[in-house]
Amino acid sequence: SNTRVEETMKTLNVGKEDLLMWSIRQQCEVGEELIDRWGSDSDDCFRDNEGRGQWVKGKELVKRQNNNHFAHHTCNKSWRCGISTSKMYSKLECQDDTDECQVYILDAEGNPINVTVDTVLHRDGVSMILKQKSTFTTRQIKAACLLIKDDKNNPESVTREHCLIDNDIYDLSKNTWNCKFNRCIKRKVEHRVKKRPPTWRHNVRAKYTEGDTATKGDLMHIQEELMYENDLLKMNIELMHAHINKLNNMLHDLIVSVAKVDERLIGNLMNNSVSSTFLSDDTFLLMPCTNPPAHTSNCYNNSIYKEGRWVANTDSSQCIDFSNYKELAIDDDVEIL
């Protein structure tokens, strides 16, 4: 029998020179589209597998199943290509012993990938190269740092050095690099951290007699203690703000993600009867919605309330009239002492 159908698909890796040319022309190069080649011409499908000669802005595969020449070999050949420029996640890391730093390019899962301006990375059917080498800058800044002990009455207690830098709190207790994605910070050894002034303790004899007039030194000591407590309070407030901002960003991303599935979510959050349709990742269109009468039916016009949302409905047999509903309270017997 010679009537079988064979379908194959092959991914071609694009070299550095070709990628650079694609970037300049903003087009990608493919081979000739072959349609219904039969007989000896069907051998054309096995030639020219380099994908040359046709420049396009983008192209998708076209699957064909035509066979108009019975008992003859026939073939179809199609190409797919595309070109785009996108930003990649990056992470800065520094070595503690040499103080040398390097920028790593990350994939969507946060794993480092080997893509540079000189090396093409072929991954998941995509060939990619960096258009520009990643760089970083260094600077020296003065930061407000406090020496904090978990238990100031215990000399063995853990001591931490917290520093406020650009509205973020960094723990610089160890003389090592503290890296957070695109930023690495290290405290200079010779720099000093503000310590808590020595305070009176219940197990230490008082330095003055109760009832005596406070000296200038006593007042200066109290002033230093208050200044330290004020700095500590401001640092804790900044730390709280950082956590709140992080939660706000997470909530924003969550709402945007869910709103692409639930078109009424944004309207409900705005307390408006509108439906949202996303035009891009961060742009959406709002359209007014009608408000059905409450507590009458699960259907209204050509819509039905199903799985927590109003959706289109053409089957009237699913509509239920519950205008004579009865409210049910489940906590009537609950007593609070």
Swiss-Prot record:
Location within or outside the cell: Virion membrane; Host cell membrane
Coiled coil: none
Entry PTM: Palmitoylated.
Glycan-modified residues: N76, N114, N271, N301
GO biological process, one term: symbiont entry into host cell
Keyword Aminoacyl-tRNA synthetase: no
Record's protein name: Major envelope glycoprotein
Protein's organism: Galleria mellonella nuclear polyhedrosis virus
